[in-house]
């Protein structure tokens, strides 16, 4: 049985473990599609995507169409004659004309247990909503938003200390085996498809910076989830006077408080205790504008005074 001719489409780091596995597999990785280089950083220099950097390092052809609205981009893909297209966080909509090019269709590695958390930010939403488990789903793509029939699922627990960053890394690594299993099943014509139950679908819309502000009138558990879900981006924040204070790490406590939500109850080497709508939140790692991430303990040792007991965080 011959290996499959694979075209890969993806942009961020999430797809790199699967790319590493693909190039070592018996399948033939013919080309990589990724988003165009974008300006980034203070100098606004054009930056290549992690997937493009990987492809160049491995001497794989790279294609970067703006979209697939023009026939030229569609024809270019068609000329590669792929058996299958593997799509992981590509970031471009694939029209029906593109989905129909590969002989075995396009398959997507999605970072949730579908049909829960269809959409752009499944990892963040799993943490925000306190899900006990997350995982990856390999599905056949159709024109809907993460609505296609499922080929394989793999689950993992979401721990109370998981951030979007740590869960992202776990799911990226655990995507490899289910993807390779699905490719083998497709190659041997033994793939099993399971339709999604649309009644169970939930949607994870795109996260934006405006959502990152902490509402101290929420519970300590809800605020803790938000801080973890928004780490490493966009990072949850509050206002300490007129200063934006980013909070990188905190945990809910069982200390009850009757003070106004947002009031700093205490600061010591264990952290900064802040009142919420129920129990206090212990803030452990912070970042002031233009400064590095620092533990509250180290901040106290620095002798600075912007934070103090009785301060109202907004």
Curated annotation (Swiss-Prot):
Enzyme Commission number(s) from the entry: 2.1.2.9
Keywords: Protein biosynthesis, Transferase
Record-linked Pfam families: Formyl_trans_C, Formyl_trans_N
InterPro entries assigned: Fmt, Formyl_trans_C, Formyl_transf_N, Formyl_transf_N_sf, Formyl_transferase-like_C_sf, GART_AS, Met-tRNA-FMT_C, Met-tRNA-FMT_N
Keyword Transcription regulation part of the UniProt annotation: no
Catalytic EC class: transferase
Reaction catalysed by this enzyme: L-methionyl-tRNA(fMet) + (6R)-10-formyltetrahydrofolate = N-formyl-L-methionyl-tRNA(fMet) + (6S)-5,6,7,8-tetrahydrofolate + H(+)
Domain of life of the native organism: Bacteria
CDD domains: FMT_core_Met-tRNA-FMT_N (cd08646), Met_tRNA_FMT_C (cd08704)
GO cellular component: cytosol
GO molecular function, one term: methionyl-tRNA formyltransferase activity
UniProt: (6S)-5,6,7,8-tetrahydrofolate binding residues: 112-115
Record's keyword annotation contains Protein biosynthesis: yes
Family: Belongs to the Fmt family.
Biological function: Attaches a formyl group to the free amino group of methionyl-tRNA(fMet). The formyl group appears to play a dual role in the initiator identity of N-formylmethionyl-tRNA by promoting its recognition by IF2 and preventing the misappropriation of this tRNA by the elongation apparatus.
Name under which the protein is recorded: Methionyl-tRNA formyltransferase
Originating organism: Legionella pneumophila (strain Lens)
Gene responsible for this protein: fmt
